[in-house]
């Protein structure tokens, strides 16, 4: 027997909220609209004259986790349901997922200059970033442009979107993932490699693309005493909640629609990017699933509240566009870590 997911009233958009066209205008000098052709930043070139960090890898297993024992999506009529524009519709967890095992690969970049109580960055969907970040950090650390930080680049528990382990971790608006990082992931890294991490929130950053990006923001939002630096590519600030939560009925859309506007400003710095042709760029607003629109709204609200925010809108670019990442990542890291002791 299948049960329909509960329907929640969709609150009206705040009429006082700045509304961006596509592309948005610059709000401050910090914001930018960039155009193709996109090119690799010079920091990607390996320089044998600078100290080279090491990349280590290990696996975490679901049976060893108290916080994420593991789920898999149930392939049924509910989990397969889409709206007119092809978006999955949120549903209660019991209707779309069941217990299931996963293996999670974790990649750790340790710079040659590492010290005790090191600054660090947690990177979601880690295998997608670790190899391209290593030469960038080697060069930038040697040049004194960023601190000698450790990168903890972790994969999710697998699959994607509603009903999946990745969706549960990344698209859920709660402190559960941040607690997992604090209580299970970082201790596992320290135990294996003998490194230690700073407790200073100014020395703790988090990064991701797509759902990994909203996850990064969520880590800082719920625990700004842990994380105060966020780097977001094509953040999923849309209605992709997993599982459905009556407290946040529109998932990540709630951040710019209700949560940030109603809350006191938090001490978070965020660099964020979206592509002109990002996911569902031509979907109407009432789908709550248009990435450029959601990121435009997010940037507007952050500026309105006085956050330290840089917004990059990439013309003729897609979702977590690799060309854009390879052009902007070094400057994004430098902006994010400005002012921190090198």
Task: Show which residues each predicted segment covers.
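Non-catalytic cap/lid and distal C-terminal segments of serine-dependent acyl enzymes
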Residues: 10-342
